[in-house]
């Protein structure tokens, strides 16, 4: 079976290519009765969209959702939900000269080796255009989690190149095109990105995502660990090369007395574990980070070979993001929400008869 589906009880299957007529997804396992309307998808889809600032790809897609099934009179019916977005701003001619060339750092060569055929237009299925439908599915998961459990999922850009936030304010994240948590640094980011774009190069980034209000008990003890599924979900996003849960790799330099999250009746004293112990949520905020590599489609020449094995220099002239991490925040939020909703439904199915167990350690009031 092709790996285009995600989840166990709450499943999402995406389809479509970057320059095809449309992209879409089928969502199965959504509980009935959730109110949902096409306009509710707009906010997150526009957060992910290209062409919203000079710091992202110039491609401009309307990203208007069509609900094809699974919703009647504004409420989910419990049957598969079909969502579709039509592509309207493809420019496939940009890829004519490189259709037979393998871009270094891109999926061109691996797709060719796996399938023996590939769609070179905009990267085809390997394009981040596919993540549009993950964000759409995430809108449903976010709403259900918020209504049913009070869970709030949100993220921010925590590193762009070598620049890191020098302050933090959640309110600032939605007020700039970088999803940056410190408004005073936005001019510095703009200057950096303007120079990068002029040079024709690209840069990597880091995104942090946090889910507050997650109850204790979600996740499985071995193969369905909450952190392992969250890591896999974030790693499935285009260009992601590393994922951390909680303190992640910084744990290697910590001592046990520092890393362990001490417990009091009033709550945990820290959250180095990222809200997950033994693969199961603790009731604290679930925290994760992902690192995205620099965009590999560049205007600068790079050595490669073509489909005949001849040595060539490739130059990509299409519309591309100089930093894919800028638009990755809503994608990371969506993937965390999808994992959490799937885990919540699985927990309810197996352990719905388990009442509240004492003692119940309070989680963090704010994240």
Swiss-Prot record:
Cofactor list: FMNH2
Q: Does the keyword Lipid metabolism apply?
A: no
The pathway this protein participates in, as annotated, is: Metabolic intermediate biosynthesis; chorismate biosynthesis; chorismate from D-erythrose 4-phosphate and phosphoenolpyruvate: step 7/7
Identify the EC number(s).
4.2.3.5
Any one GO molecular-function label of the UniProt entry: chorismate synthase activity
- Sites binding FMN sit at 125-127, 238-239, 278, 293-297, 319
Keyword set for this entry? Answer: Amino-acid biosynthesis, Aromatic amino acid biosynthesis, FAD, Flavoprotein, FMN, Lyase, NADP
User: What family does this chain come from, according to its entry?
Assistant: Belongs to the chorismate synthase family.
Give the superkingdom in one word.
Bacteria
Q: What class of enzyme is it?
A: lyase
Q: What is this protein called?
A: Chorismate synthase
Q: Which reaction does it catalyse?
A: 5-O-(1-carboxyvinyl)-3-phosphoshikimate = chorismate + phosphate
Q: Which SUPFAM superfamilies match?
A: Chorismate synthase, AroC
PROSITE patterns listed in its UniProt record:
CHORISMATE_SYNTHASE_1 (PS00787), CHORISMATE_SYNTHASE_2 (PS00788), CHORISMATE_SYNTHASE_3 (PS00789)
**Gene Ontology, cellular component aspect:** cytosol
Naturally occurring in which organism (per UniProt): Xanthomonas campestris pv. campestris (strain B100)
Signal peptide as annotated in the record: none
Q: What is one process in the GO biological process aspect for this record?
A: aromatic amino acid family biosynthetic process
